[in-house]
């Protein structure tokens, strides 16, 4: 591996995620990859390591499969709750396909909540729906609501498989456009709408259009702030998870290209499920698979010489529960030493 400017005070890039633990400014960490490559195990394990060096860590799953509950053997939901056995690691699971109606609700008791109580009424809701991607994007507001009200030092996202991941990262931009469009329409037709709504008894929850607009503007500012943070390499990074196979490597390369186009930093790759048969092993299948894996591992190292590439072994047992996750997480910072081949 060649040296790069990304590493300070060292001649080579460590095959670990230690650099993420040392980066004290880091606030947002996305973990993503193709389905079935150990993405959730990696994100849970990274969150465990971060909890050792940070005051408070929030792990969020945006994968509809919601594997966090399975990984820790504990039920998580839409509200952040502490992971059993930790006093500074919390987790939550949100549905990225959450309906816009859940968030653009009808005011009432929630009228003071800029995200849950926008109270837009039928016409404004139709306008919101007309903006591509806004239905999915609105669930991002749920994340912002949690993050804003609870001050976590670092947030780890266990994202959905590759395609969904990148869509999720576009959500702040989609929402900014949606809210800007609604603000523009409302400023043009606001007085007329207010008089029509006044004649009909106003919007649900007794709000007027100006109140709704100010709530939307406050939401837009929050989204803009988060969007800027996502593009700041001091605050945000993306950890790619893959296995040493052609399709997974192809997906990883595509993902890295897209992340670069979104100006999102990525400099760590975790390669899971590697076989390390000993030199006395009689398993021909293991040796053949290892040969194939070495080929793709060499490609990964050639393509990403300025990345921290972490090599994780194929394990005999499933990584589930606090103890096994802690063991796995240790290998993210202390490289696994394979037997001699």
Swiss-Prot record:
Location within or outside the cell: Cytoplasm; Endoplasmic reticulum
GO function term, MF aspect, one: ATP hydrolysis activity
Keywords of the record: ATP-binding, Cytoplasm, Endoplasmic reticulum, Hydrolase, Metal-binding, Nucleotide-binding, Transport, Zinc
Catalytic machinery residues: 63
Major enzyme class: hydrolase
CDD domains listed in its UniProt record: ArsA
Pfam families recorded: ArsA_ATPase
Entries under InterPro entries matching the protein: Anion-transp_ATPase-like_dom (IPR025723), ATPase_ArsA/GET3 (IPR016300), ATPase_ArsA/GET3_euk (IPR027542), P-loop_NTPase (IPR027417)
Function recorded in the entry: ATPase required for the post-translational delivery of tail-anchored (TA) proteins to the endoplasmic reticulum. Recognizes and selectively binds the transmembrane domain of TA proteins in the cytosol. This complex then targets to the endoplasmic reticulum by membrane-bound receptors, where the tail-anchored protein is released for insertion. This process is regulated by ATP binding and hydrolysis. ATP binding drives the homodimer towards the closed dimer state, facilitating recognition of newly synthesized TA membrane proteins. ATP hydrolysis is required for insertion.
Protein name: ATPase GET3
Origin species: Ajellomyces capsulatus (strain G186AR / H82 / ATCC MYA-2454 / RMSCC 2432)
Gene: GET3
């Amino acid at each position: 591996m060649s040296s790069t400017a990304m590493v300070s005070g060292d001649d080579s890039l460590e095959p670990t995620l230690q650099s993420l633990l040392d980066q004290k400014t880091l606030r947002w960490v996305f973990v993503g990859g193709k389905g079935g490559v150990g993405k959730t195990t990696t994100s849970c394990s990274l969150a465990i390591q971060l909890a050792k060096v940070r005051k408070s860590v929030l792990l969020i799953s945006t994968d509809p499969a919601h594997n966090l509950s399975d990984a820790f053997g504990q039920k998580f939901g839409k509200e952040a709750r502490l992971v059993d056995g930790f006093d500074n690691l919390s987790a939550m699971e949100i549905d990225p396909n959450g309906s816009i109606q859940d968030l653009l609700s009808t005011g009432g008791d929630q009228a003071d909540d800029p995200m849950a109580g926008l109270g837009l009424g039928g016409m404004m809701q139709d306008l919101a729906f007309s903006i591509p991607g806004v239905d999915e994007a609105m669930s991002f507001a749920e994340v912002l609501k949690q993050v804003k009200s609870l001050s976590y030092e670092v947030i780890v996202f266990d994202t959905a498989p590759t395609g969904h991941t990148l869509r999720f990262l576009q959500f702040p931009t989609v929402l900014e456009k949606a809210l800007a469009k609604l603000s523009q329409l409302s400023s043009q037709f606001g007085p007329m709408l207010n008089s029509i709504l006044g004649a009909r008894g106003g919007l649900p929850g007794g709000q007027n259009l100006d109140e709704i607009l100010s709530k939307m503007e406050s939401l837009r500012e929050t989204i803009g702030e988060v969007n800027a943070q996502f593009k700041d390499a001091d605050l945000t990074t993306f950890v790619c998870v893959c296995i040493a196979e052609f399709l997974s490597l192809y997906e990883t390369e595509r993902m890295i290209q897209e992340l670069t186009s979104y100006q999102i930093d990525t400099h760590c790759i975790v390669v899971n499920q590697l076989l390390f048969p000993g030199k006395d092993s009689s398993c021909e299948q293991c040796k053949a698979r290892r040969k194939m894996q070495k080929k793709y591992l060499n490609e990964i190292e050639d393509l990403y010489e300025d990345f921290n590439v972490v090599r994780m072994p194929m394990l005999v047992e499933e990584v589930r529960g606090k103890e096994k996750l802690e063991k796995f997480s240790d290998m993210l910072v202390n490289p696994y030493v394979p037997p001699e081949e």
